[in-house]
């Protein structure tokens, strides 16, 4: 079932990318370098995309990015508590043909309880910042480089 679900979600994502190629929409994202109380980074692997990523996602134009990143952390990793939330920067990118403004946050002292199963998130790991796992997505690598100076 996992293989079929991955294939289906990947196909849907590919159709969305085709739509974005034509429309070139303006989108907004909020993503977090979520750190456990021990200082480990929390990374997610999505069912429809390759590589380990920073948790986060899209939000509406009028939604506060800080609220959005906290919502995404609750949805993706099951965050139950957190400490300081710091805006680390904003990055303009063109992922999948979209014009995206990504707000990057550092969220400290994150406590979470992963859901047993999720449509979107296939796996969650914790890793020390100086020993991140192989297979980081290129976007996660860029964002981590941008955020490391804010730690």
Functional labels for PLM-detected ranges:
Residues 36-76:
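Conserved Nudix-box catalytic region and its N-terminal flanking loop in Nudix hydrolases
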Residues 50-51, 117-151:
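Nudix hydrolase/Nudix homology domain
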Residues 34, 104-108, 128:
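Short, well-ordered beta-strand micro-motif
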Residues 1-31:
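Acidic, metal-coordinating catalytic segment for phosphate/diphosphate chemistry
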Residues 90-114, 147-148:
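Active-site-adjacent beta-strand/loop module that shapes the phosphate/pyrophosphate-binding cleft
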Residues 80-90:
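A short coil-to-beta-strand element that immediately follows conserved catalytic motifs
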């Amino acid at each position: 079932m996992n293989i079929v679900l991955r294939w289906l979600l990947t196909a849907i994502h590919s159709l969305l990318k085709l739509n974005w190629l034509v429309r070139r929409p303006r989108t907004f994202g909020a993503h977090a370098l979520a750190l456990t109380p021990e200082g480990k980074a929390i990374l997610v692997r999505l069912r429809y995309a390759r590589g380990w990523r920073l948790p986060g996602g899209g939000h509406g134009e009028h939604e506060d990015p800080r609220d959005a990143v906290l919502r995404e952390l609750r949805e993706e990793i099951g965050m139950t508590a957190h400490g300081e939330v710091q805006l680390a920067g904003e990055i303009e990118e063109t992922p999948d043909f979209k014009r995206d403004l990504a707000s990057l946050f550092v969220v400290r002292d994150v406590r979470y309880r992963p859901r047993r199963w999720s449509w979107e998130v296939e796996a969650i790991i914790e890793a020390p910042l100086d020993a991140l796992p192989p297979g980081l997505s290129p976007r996660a690598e860029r964002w981590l480089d941008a955020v490391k100076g804010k730690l």
